[in-house]
């Protein structure tokens, strides 16, 4: 039975710019939406122009001082904020750029609205490719992330859902989400990521399992360089199957960071777009309400391909291998296909023995779980949001240029030899 899918897209979210040479490119969201539009996938979803999160919404997780700082700081006044910039870890990886707070408000509002719609059973699946910024902490920015829309979305889901499962397939450990829910059994966090050799953020060892009420409700799958589709699937499907069976979540949040693909500028895995998509399809197969978010992904053309393909899987619509013509068509040269070869020469350092050892440790930890912990009945606060559906029936009639504008920064896609990549001095 086909699911009702809600899709959140803000036409301005792709126009923000972290700065020259910065690997995080919000422009990838405009490319993704353009493909979703030109493949006709929007016809299979309810399309919303999302709510913009307020300071109050953000302070459901973050400290007031930190959010107040994000709202006030700008490139023109940042000299007066030296102490705060250091205190809140804003600077190199997380620069101050024009419209910073507005950018956070837009991607966070979409995740929050997605959670509210799932709570109110308006949809079965909610998609916000602009969200998934999993490194942000209560008191500080981290790893290109300022406001943790995932934590804020999960807090909204917890008003109605006794147990929320969070799954993270970004190449980086979902440290901000893990930290937020480390002491509770209401949220189980499961992160598959590269671990070791000082890889950012340096957390996510198998032995980080949660504490107090949350002991064993935190699960980490530390992987080595070069993991391919087959090895990843060998771990992902049995682990997620067991977790769902033991924990019995009433809602799932899936962070789909695309930096776990081969050929990512900051990544060292070897997943194909199909292999990445298979994880999304597998999570969908449990038929549990699902909030799907973006995350990392720094080879822009492949991020757009990946999230478009995953949108097609979520709406159960087969799409052609040849990309439809769009105003961004030249970005997808030379092949102009949905599934180019993204494999690299990086050797798969995840031996069968290593993967089996991880599996065994994880399954032993899962046996320690209290099956499906229950929650006392409580009063549910009123929803923070009232919102209007964007009637997208006229999307075909509008010219593509009316749907999104190109970013002002000419170097948004590639900055040449000075661009930061994995050899650079910016630690990712």
UniProtKB/Swiss-Prot annotation:
Class in the EC hierarchy, top level: hydrolase
Database matches in CDD domains: HDAC3
Residues the record lists as Phosphoserine modifications: 424
Binding sites annotated in the UniProt record for 1D-myo-inositol 1,4,5,6-tetrakisphosphate: 17, 21, 25, 265
Subcellular location: Nucleus; Chromosome; Cytoplasm; Cytoplasm, Cytosol
Biased composition regions of type Basic and acidic residues, renumbered to the chain: 388-405, 415-428
Regulation of this protein's activity per its record: Inositol tetraphosphate (1D-myo-inositol 1,4,5,6-tetrakisphosphate) promotes the histone deacetylase activity by acting as an intermolecular glue between HDAC3 and NCOR2, thereby promoting its association with the N-Cor complex, a prerequisite for the histone deacetylase activity.
Disruption-associated phenotype: Liver-specific knockout mice exhibit low amplitude of circadian rhythms, dampened E-box-driven transcription and a significant reduction in the protein levels of BMAL1 and CRY1 in the liver.
Signal peptide per UniProt: none
Pfam families: Hist_deacetyl (PF00850)
UniProt xrefs under InterPro entries: HDAC_PDAC, His_deacetylse, His_deacetylse_1, His_deacetylse_dom, His_deacetylse_dom_sf, Ureohydrolase_dom_sf
Positions of the catalytic residues: 135
Keyword Protein transport: no
Consequence recorded when altering residue 424 to A: Deacetylase-dead mutant. No effect on its interaction with BMAL1, CRY1 and FBXL3 or its ability to regulate the circadian clock
Catalytic activity, EC: 3.5.1.98, 3.5.1.-
Any one GO molecular-function label of the UniProt entry: NF-kappaB binding
GO terms under biological process: cellular response to fluid shear stress; cellular response to mechanical stimulus; cellular response to parathyroid hormone stimulus; chromatin organization; circadian regulation of gene expression; cornified envelope assembly; DNA repair-dependent chromatin remodeling; epidermis development
UniProt region (Disordered), positions on chain: 388-428
A single cellular component GO annotation: nucleoplasm
PTM comment text: Sumoylated in vitro. Deubiquitinated on 'Lys-63'-linked ubiquitin chains by USP38; leading to a decreased level of histone acetylation.
Keywords: Biological rhythms, Chromatin regulator, Chromosome, Cytoplasm, Hydrolase, Metal-binding, Nucleus, Phosphoprotein, Repressor, Transcription, Transcription regulation, Ubl conjugation, Zinc
Similarity remark: Belongs to the histone deacetylase family. HD type 1 subfamily.
Function: Histone deacetylase that catalyzes the deacetylation of lysine residues on the N-terminal part of the core histones (H2A, H2B, H3 and H4), and some other non-histone substrates. Histone deacetylation gives a tag for epigenetic repression and plays an important role in transcriptional regulation, cell cycle progression and developmental events. Histone deacetylases act via the formation of large multiprotein complexes, such as N-Cor repressor complex, which activate the histone deacetylase activity.
Protein name: Histone deacetylase 3
Organism of origin: Mus musculus
Gene (UniProt): Hdac3
């Amino acid at each position: 039975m086909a699911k009702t899918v809600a899709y959140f897209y803000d036409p301005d979210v792709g126009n923000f710019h972290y700065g020259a040479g910065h690997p995080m490119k919000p422009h990838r969201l405009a490319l993704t939406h353009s493909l979703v539009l030109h493949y006709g996938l929007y016809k299979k979803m309810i399309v919303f122009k999302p709510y913009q999160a307020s300071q109050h919404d953000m302070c459901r997780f973050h400290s007031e001082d930190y959010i107040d700082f994000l709202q006030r700081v700008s490139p023109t006044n940042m000299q007066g904020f030296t102490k705060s910039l250091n205190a809140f870890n804003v600077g190199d990886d997380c620069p101050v750029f024009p419209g910073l707070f507005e950018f956070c408000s837009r991607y966070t509002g979409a995740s929050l609205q997605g959670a509210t719609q799932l709570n109110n059973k308006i949809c079965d699946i909610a998609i916000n490719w602009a969200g998934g910024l999993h490194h942000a902490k209560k008191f500080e920015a981290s790893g290109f992330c300022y406001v943790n829309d995932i934590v804020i979305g999960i807090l909204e889901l917890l008003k109605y859902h006794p147990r929320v499962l969070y799954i993270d397939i970004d190449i980086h450990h979902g440290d901000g989400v893990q930290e937020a829910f480390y002491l509770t059994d209401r949220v189980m966090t499961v992160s598959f990521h590269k671990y070791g050799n000082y890889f950012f953020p340096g957390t996510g060892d198998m032995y980080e399992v949660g504490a107090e009420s949350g002991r064993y409700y935190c699960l980490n799958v530390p992987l080595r360089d070069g993991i391919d589709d087959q090895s990843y699937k060998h771990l992902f499907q049995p682990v997620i199957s067991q977790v769902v069976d033991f924990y019995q979540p009433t809602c799932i949040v899936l962070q789909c960071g695309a930096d776990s693909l081969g050929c990512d500028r900051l990544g060292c895995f070897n997943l194909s777009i199909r292999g990445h998509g298979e994880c999304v399809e597998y999570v969908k197969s449990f038929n549990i309400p699902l909030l799907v978010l973006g995350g990392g992904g720094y080879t822009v053309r492949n991020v757009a391909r990946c999230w478009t393909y995953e949108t097609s899987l979520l709406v159960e619509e087969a799409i052609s291998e040849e990309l439809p013509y769009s105003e961004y068509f030249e970005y997808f040269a030379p092949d102009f296909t949905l599934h180019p070869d993204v494999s690299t020469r990086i050797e798969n350092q995840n031996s069968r023995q290593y993967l089996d050892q991880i599996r065994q440790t994880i399954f032993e930890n899962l046996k320690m779980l209290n099956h499906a912990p229950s929650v006392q009945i409580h009063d549910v606060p009123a929803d923070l949001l009232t919102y209007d559906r964007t009637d997208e029936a006229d999307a075909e009639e509008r010219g593509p240029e009316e749907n999104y504008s190109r970013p002002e920064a000419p170097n948004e896609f590639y900055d040449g030899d000075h661009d930061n990549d994995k050899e650079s001095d910016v630690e990712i």
